[in-house]
């Protein structure tokens, strides 16, 4: 990993070298003063300092353009096609994608990056460092079995007893034998099923993409009931970037009641036996996160306006609401009196549970945090989107124990076993993509984060995705993964 922790007052030799070189590295005669290459660092709230570089040039039409070099984000001399605004007086702005504000003072370029206003300090340089060679890992185990789901999926498999349950983009919901991958039953719905199912004693519950809560007989796969959770609307979609919003809220089953969020901005309580809506709490914004439980009576969930809500399920009263700067699609978790949640403002947050005050922030640079943390033995394990790492973090201090590149979009919850951490990754092949991703499954050493092996997925189709978007599941000593290629597979957990 390229990041490193440096005390605030510590000398930065890299910048000192840039300063010595700057005497002979001024802008060419007649050029805009900002033109050329700038190298330096960017600093995150947790104290992490990473190498960062910008290069500015004029295009044929005269517009000021830039390239970015940000190794920690796997971004190498990337052109994003976003114009640079010259505000005069040495001030420049790159918005809205990066919220990058810069001030040019001689051979120094400083400013802030992103909504969190991360400090950037640059000096003139000659060229970006060379791109590192791709990492080569030992191949992982071959699948023990493979089941054809009939369509790809964004949803994670759920293991209950000897069975695996999951939905697909085609609206198919499968029950599969975990031992040999044979079909037990398949139910066909009218809409895609992108969310995680919850399994009760005799019923499986899942939300489809049109905000219908579906209850299926666990043994036969027949429909028991369907409850629309969209109060007069035909379903709701996340408000921005629909390419990456293939998700539905995860229900919580508790004491005969299914609690589930909806894109209509409500948190619903539904009778698990009949499908009757018992009540709806207006959360004020679409709810695509899962519902977590604190103690015996407090529900926890996130909203697309950046809120994290704690709700007394008996009194139906909010006991705490804290705000982040972006949509929250992760399920909140609590450890050591700290409420932990990821946000689309590129931050993983820790809030003091007692009063909602900030405890810590962990920056993912300009990567959404869509991975719900796995809390195991006093550590949380979290994936990332473009940051493409699994990170083990102390939930009380917010300090990383280790952080390992996995080279793909990592949206699911890491699967943690006694010795290993397994994660699925996604490759995207969308027009305009500047960050290369790899789809597959990786195994890491739980203690150190060192990579053990990698199973590569088929390449992503044009304007599509490849790999494994949902969390992995554990069935005995096998890892279960469901892919965009329509295959459900089992791998030996080694």
Residue ranges, per PLM feature:
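Edge beta-strand at a domain terminus
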Residues: 77-88, 106-108, 112-137, 488
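Extracytoplasmic beta-rich repeat domains
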Residues: 131-158, 184-200, 223-254, 279-295, ...
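Short loop/turn segments that connect beta-strands within beta-propeller blades
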Residues: 177-181, 217-220, 271-274, 312-316, ...
């Amino acid at each position: 990993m390229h990041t490193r922790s440096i005390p605030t007052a510590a000398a930065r030799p890299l910048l000192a070298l840039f300063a010595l070189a700057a005497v002979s590295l001024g802008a060419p005669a007649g050029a805009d003063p900002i033109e050329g290459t700038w190298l330096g660092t960017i600093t995150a709230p947790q104290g992490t300092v990473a190498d960062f570089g910008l290069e500015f040039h004029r295009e044929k039409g005269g517009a000021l353009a830039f390239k970015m070099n940000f190794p920690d984000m796997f971004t190498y001399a990337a052109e994003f096609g976003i114009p640079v605004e010259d505000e005069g007086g040495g001030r420049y702005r790159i918005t809205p994608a990066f919220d990058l504000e810069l001030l040019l003072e001689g051979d120094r370029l400083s400013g802030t990056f992103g909504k969190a206003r991360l400090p950037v300090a640059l000096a003139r340089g000659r060229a970006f460092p060379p791109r590192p060679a791709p990492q080569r890992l030992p191949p992982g185990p071959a699948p023990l079995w493979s089941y054809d789901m009939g369509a790809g999926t964004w949803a994670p498999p759920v293991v209950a007893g000897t069975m695996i349950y999951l939905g697909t983009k085609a609206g198919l919901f499968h029950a599969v034998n975990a031992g040999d991958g044979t079909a037990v039953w398949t139910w066909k719905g009218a809409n895609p099923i992108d969310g995680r199912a919850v399994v009760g004693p005799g019923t499986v519950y899942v939300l489809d993409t049109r905000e219908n809560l579906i209850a299926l007989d666990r043994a036969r796969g027949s429909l028991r009931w369907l409850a629309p959770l969209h109060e007069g609307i035909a379903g709701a979609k996340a408000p921005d970037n629909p390419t990456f919003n293939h998700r539905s809220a995860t229900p919580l089953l508790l004491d005969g009641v299914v609690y589930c969020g909806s894109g209509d901005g409500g948190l619903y309580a539904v009778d698990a036996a009949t499908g009757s809506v018992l009540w709806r709490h207006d959360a004020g914004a679409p709810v695509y996160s899962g519902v977590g439980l604190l103690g015996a009576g407090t529900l926890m969930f996130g909203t697309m306006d950046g809120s994290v809500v704690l709700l007394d399920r008996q009194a139906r009263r909010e006991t705490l609401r804290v705000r982040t700067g972006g949509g929250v699609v992760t399920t909140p978790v609590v450890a050591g009196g700290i409420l932990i949640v990821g946000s689309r403002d590129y931050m993983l947050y820790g809030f003091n549970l007692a009063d909602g005050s900030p405890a810590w922030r962990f920056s993912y640079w300009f990567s959404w945090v869509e991975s719900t943390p796995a809390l195991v033995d006093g550590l949380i394990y979290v994936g990332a989107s473009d940051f493409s790492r699994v990170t083990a973090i102390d939930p009380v201090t917010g300090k990383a124990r280790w952080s390992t590149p996995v080279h793909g979009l990592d949206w699911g919850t890491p699967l943690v076993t006694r010795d290993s951490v397994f994660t699925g990754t996604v490759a995207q092949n969308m027009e305009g993509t500047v960050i290369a991703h790899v789809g597959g499954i990786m195994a890491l050493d739980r203690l150190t984060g060192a990579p053990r092996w990698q199973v590569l997925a088929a390449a992503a189709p044009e304007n599509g995705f490849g790999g494994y978007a949902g969390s992995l599941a554990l069935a005995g000593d096998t890892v279960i993964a469901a892919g965009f290629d329509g295959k459900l597979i089992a791998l030996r957990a080694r």
